[in-house]
Amino acid sequence: MNITSEELLKEARALEPQLQQWRRTLHRHPEVGFDLPHTKELVKKALTEMGYEPKDCGKAGVIALAGGKKPGKTILLRADMDALPIPEDSGEEFSSEVPGKMHGCGHDMHTAMLLGAAKLLKAHEDELEGTVKLEFQPAEEIFQGSPDMIAGGLLEDPHVDAAVMFHVLAGMPLPVGTVLVPGGGITMASCEQYHIVVKGKGGHGSTPENCIDPITAAAHIHIALQEINSRELKPGDFGVLTTGRFEAGAASNVIPDVAQMWGTIRTTDPENKTGELIRTRMTEIAQGVAAAYRCTAEVSFADYCPCMVVDKPLAENAMDYMTELLGKGAMDMTALTGGKPGGGSEDFAFVSHKVPTVSMFIAAGGPEQGCCYGQHHPKVRFDDSILYEGSAAFGWFALRWLYDNAGIAF
């Protein structure tokens, strides 16, 4: 391999103006779920101009191939593209121009980083000892994009042997650009959506005796569900049950017929037995409490996303490669987490259950940079000075891993 880590980092830094332009254009025009026409257009146009032949994958994904001129393995590099359905209040000069939508998780950063990596890899395509598959994924926030692209053939033609993703972190008191590398095993929780519909009998607020109040029942259900963690799970078992949305009625003087709540269940049990227990008890508790208040309760679950599983040998590769590229800018994530999985979830986990995978994080600004809020907050900011490091990290990982797996001494 003729390129060194220092040279690749220098080439990536030269891309900063373009990286920032891509990121800020995407940030101004956020799109959510699978409905990403403008985002896809930007990605495909940029890839085509670099010399790639981008292809659609699944409902709204884009893939492209680099290398393939030499026999060897295939490594997948992934960036998610979708935004969140929340209003932006960051104060950035390039804030969202779309009411009620915002890139509040940094997926605009990821997309720009992978486009930068695509440019670097195209420039060094003759040095790739195998193939790099670039994945631009929709619908991560609803945990549907990854399984959809897998069903669309993401991991085949050519078959993927390893997979890599990076996620930016905002609001963390870490040096900007620090890459956090996990130690292997389960690193992120599973997640599942739940929906509870409590049905009663509506009427005038002045005559509750003639009604069956679903709000009272739903409120008691919500409180009772919080006892599952403390009374039903073994000490040490990780389980988080959160109700994030509660709706009932439309007028202050009317008892409604229906009250509803939506939320999530998160566990770190790879076999999901903890999740099964929580689901069973949720249903029993909701229906039992509802009956005590003369109501009925319907409980449903959807959009299950498994735990993220990081391949230990690949994580060891990652630590070596990121140290080569960034020196002390690479950090063992277990120093922060104690080796315990995080409670967040990521739908790239579907890939991690099929091929060896590593998911890393990049510190994208903390309080010193004015990035005082974390992901999914309307005021969150990301320091896009780290974009070139993300591009270089993607590119260097691919180059080095293909070399290592071609049996060539570095």
Feature locations, PLM:
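Electropositive phosphate-/nucleotide-binding environments in soluble metabolic enzymes
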Residues: 2, 6-9, 13-20, 33, ...
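Acidic/His- and Gly-rich active-site-bordering loop/insert found
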Residues: 2-103, 108, 112-129
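Histidine-centered active-site/metal-ligand motif
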Residues: 27-29, 103, 107-110, 167, ...
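Non-cysteine beta-strand/loop elements that form the S-adenosyl-L-methionine
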Residues: 76-78, 87, 194-196, 359-364
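Histidine/acidic-residue-rich, glycine-tolerant segments that coordinate divalent metal ions
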Residues: 84, 91-102, 109, 121-256, ...
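Metal-dependent amide/peptide-bond hydrolase catalytic core
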Residues: 219-410
